[in-house]
Amino acid sequence: MGLVLKEFNNKIRTALILAPFFTFAQIVIDLIIPSFLASAISVVFSIDKLKQDESGGKTISVDFIGGANINFANVREAQIVLATTVILLALCGLFFGLISIYCASYVSANTSFLLRKKIFAKLMRITTPSHDHYGSSTLLVRLTNDVYLMEVIAFDFLRLIIRAPLLFIGGLVFAVTTNQDMSISLLITFPLILLVIGILNRKSIPLFKENQKSVDKINERVEEDVSGYKVIQSFNLHSFTNNKFKIANEGWKKNSTSSLFINSLNIPFTFFLSSLTIIIALLLVFQLDSSVSVDPLPQDAAIRPNIFAFFQYNFYIVLGFILTSLTMVNFNRSRVALGRIKDILSQPEIKTITNKDQKELLPTLEFRNISFGLGNKNNNNFLQNLSFKFEAYKTYGIVGPTGSGKSLIANIIGGLYEPNEGEILIGGEKIQSIDSLYLSEMIGIVFQQNILFKGTISSNIKIGIETRSDWKNQSDLQKNEAMKNAAKIACADTFIEKFSDSYDHNVEQLGKNLSGGQKQRVAIARTLITKPRILVFDDSMSALDALTEKKVRENIENDLKLTTKIIISQNINSIKHADKILVIDNGRIVGFDSDQKLMKNCSLYQKMKESQKDLGGDFDAVN
């Protein structure tokens, strides 16, 4: 709750105060009621004597626990007053309890709402290495299950954490006041209850940690298998994947069984010790209280109500222990969850730079001695001492074998990774001094993995301009025209207009109802609509046929003459038209020149081009 306390509005703060207040009021009433019930029982057991007193003209005196007594004119008045008082107290307790529950529910629900909002906003801002470290399955668990546990403990804090000690302390005080002889039994069983709860609580914490790890593994397993179901189907890997899931599921079952068993022992042990308390109390009262006889004689009337009240307060003491143990279970689970949430919230964020005096920059890109490794260790850099410069308005290619580091360069250009060494310059300015918003609007990247969002084709293409400052005052008509123009450049209009609902065609989650080529063209249009001044294609035309790819390249060259274009690909045919081509091998630059010159002075480029010719990779004759 403390993580979002500052974000509480006045309504939530009011509920935060009222919840414990009405909980306290409810407990006070609950503790008073047994005293009135005991007095009512004393009236019932002494009814004959009271009638005799009444006939003799005497007032009726009813004793209450704690030594207080009230005089009544007759038996009927005593019955009516006591019955009415108990009913009114019960109704007040119910009313206060309902208000307390509502306020606690309101606060806990808003706590989870604000916490989930805060975590989600953080996930959208954490650095790519942090995201890669945790993985989407673990992040999903922390956003859902862990936040739910925090909601539970917030409710417990406002209700049970206050209710449990009040029931215990209040029950203990009233029990001692009711009958000191019977209260001796509490000295015997009370330490045993504390010992049991302490031992079980200590054993449960590591089990909950292991249980949360098991949940992460199951989510990771499910996410991987569901995402790769086509591979599983094609290779008939059902038994293999079922076995892997079974292992993860059995690990969770084992940890869950142990944690549930340990924490469930609280209740039976507590009830056992409660019954033991009652037995010891009865033995003590018959041994120590000489007013109690074997036969139900009138002199026993005073002790019988006290025995009833003592049992009631003993129940409150036991209930306080049970609520404490249940709260401790949730507390231990939430403490593990809180640590995991704090771990996420403490992760470094993408740096935001504000420069109100930001000037227009030429779309040039320069790497100066850039080194980078996913391990973030300078002595383990994969990209080694990269230095090159892309001039404005020209087209550049980046090519290299699989795993050579091409996509790493794209991610560094897009600001997803920060280099361990070296400098990046845009328009001759160090990237650290450029306004972040200006930079994001200046650079556009079409990533290797084309992620589309659930919605429509229109919403997916226009999502790129929804938050841009230069589009805020544009009309829907202007946005639609820009969308159609971007789709035309990306050759996406040819299939979009075949749909009956055209640009309003439904797109399922991750674009599952579109083909690979269709998704790539929508993704290209989504970036083109932003009119970036530096445009990066990270192997983002791989699903297009040769004719369509050539047409898209030609459209981009003709329509984006004032844009610096960077095309990353393994296919020589996709980049050989570029003004210059950067050849990467194992994280190092092995060539940077035009296609013709690289064919003379770069052996790797020569080998790649020859191998792709042999495989039918040169499509010039076809095109």
UniProtKB/Swiss-Prot annotation:
Coiled-coil regions listed: none
Annotated positions binding ATP: G400, P401, T402, G403, S404, G405, K406, S407
Bilayer disposition of the protein: Multi-pass membrane protein
InterPro entries the record matches: AAA+_ATPase, ABC1_TM_dom, ABC1_TM_sf, ABC_transporter-like_ATP-bd, ABC_transporter-like_CS, P-loop_NTPase, Type_1_exporter
Keyword vocabulary terms for this entry: ATP-binding, Cell membrane, Membrane, Nucleotide-binding, Transmembrane, Transmembrane helix, Transport
CDD domains: ABC_6TM_Tm287_like
GO MF entry, a single one: ABC-type transporter activity
Compartmental location: Cell membrane
SUPFAM superfamilies: ABC transporter transmembrane region (SSF90123), P-loop containing nucleoside triphosphate hydrolases (SSF52540)
Classification via PANTHER family: ATP-BINDING CASSETTE SUB-FAMILY B MEMBER 10, MITOCHONDRIAL, ATP-DEPENDENT PERMEASE MDL1, MITOCHONDRIAL
Protein name per UniProt: Putative ABC transporter ATP-binding protein MG014
Source organism: Mycoplasma genitalium (strain ATCC 33530 / DSM 19775 / NCTC 10195 / G37)
